[in-house]
């Protein structure tokens, strides 16, 4: 017998829709409240529940109501403790398939969520949200409002709210100008969307380079790379860029130089420094591995002065005046970059670093086995990668003369010229700054494949992995029990001393 106290839910009415064209997909079920169209009657019934405040599916234990029966089924598992969705890599279980999918990212290392400003990727939506709030506060435009100068976006699809021609329902939306179709994109029909889904490919394809995207707004931003449109302008030097990531990378040059930076010095083919003008500065900064911050050198020596010419006072160089003039003109704000990405505050420091690229690798790291040609390069590697201070290292062969005194670049390594924009701390190298920034972003990019924990630095992960293994390098000489770290062994020995 039916309960008369329950309210009667009005049945959804299939409103008559517009006459379908020959190419339009068949969506015969229309909502009488908002006019949206659906391909199946079950989708229309599920959608119609949004227009009513009724939640007919109630939990028999806590009384909470749900609009759909499958939502109630998932909720009941919170009372029973049932976790039918098991992970194949670890013994963890989950109440629904969504939780299992989010967990599997821990084992696969996949990072499906990408920041559209700096192109960093994250494993969860919450991590991406924290990154956007901390690093790009107020810099992100509305998802449906393109930046000035970009090709105009179409308005959202009336069925699924996607921007541009819809890959789900085939709707074209109300175009604003040419929209995305004028941006070299192919058509977005149901056939293409189904083929892309079957091949696990994003549905939006660029007609110029065949690159695919998950959303129409990403395709619109990407299309600027194929055109002369550069809507992103640097507020300091008025240079234009066609992508926000390129603009953020360019801003680092101003941060490294400071607000009152000297003119850029570029070594020309003639051998002397030239002050680059506005047009030259734009050409230099266009290369992906060059910066507007100082002397541009290459370890191969092609088209640049020789290594001896960089050190002032050397005899036998064919052009002594040009390097000397460059050394006098350099200041504390001028940085010198090697092609490997390392910055130096002086030309002698860079010249000493270049020996690590050209000379024989005779100095070995006792931690990872990396070989270096110069002792200074080995000390920098041990300090940056393994957290050790400057110490003596025994070379594999002869040539330990550099261990007796500081190298040419030792004074520059003591300077802290790389600053954090969040807490204003200074660091000696870009690597140290990158490691420190992880404290502010909360990122932990090193996962443990055994238990799923994440760590901020690789050394922390290596130490944690000992927990899953049988190796215990620090044994107790009294009871024979082994420990992973020396600090744990010290605490254990205090127990023996307390029992004695």
From Swiss-Prot:
Q: From the Swiss-Prot or TrEMBL record, what is one GO molecular function term? A: zinc ion binding
The alphabetized UniProt keywords are: Acetylation, Cytoplasm, Metal-binding, Nucleus, Repeat, Repressor, Transcription, Transcription regulation, Zinc, Zinc-finger
Compartments (UniProt record): Cytoplasm; Nucleus
Expression by tissue, per the entry, reads: Widely expressed. In the retina, highest expression in the ganglion cell layer.
What segments bear the compositional bias annotation Pro residues? 9-19
Q: Which InterPro entries match?
A: Krueppel_C2H2_ZnFinger, Znf-C2H2_ZIC1-5/GLI1-3-like, Znf_C2H2_sf, Znf_C2H2_type
Q: Does the keyword Repressor apply?
A: yes
List residue spans of C2H2-type Zn fingers: 29-51, 57-79, 85-107, 113-136, 204-226, 232-254, 336-357, 363-386, 418-440, 446-468, 474-496
Coiled coil feature spans: none
Keyword Zinc assigned = yes
- Report the residues modified as N-acetylmethionine: 1
Name the SUPFAM superfamilies for this protein.
Answer: beta-beta-alpha zinc fingers
Signal peptide range: none
Q: Where is this region: Disordered?
A: 1-24, 255-284, 306-328, 383-415
Here the segments flagged for biased composition (Polar residues) are 256-267
Q: Which PANTHER family match?
A: IP01015P-RELATED
On subunit structure and binding partners, the annotation says: Interacts with FLT3 cytoplasmic catalytic domain, following receptor stimulation, in a kinase-independent manner. Does not interact with other structurally related receptor tyrosine kinases, including KIT, CSF1R and PDGFR. Interacts with NRL.
Q: What is this protein called?
A: Flt3-interacting zinc finger protein 1
Which species is listed as the source?
Answer: Mus musculus
Q: Which gene name belongs to this protein?
A: Fiz1
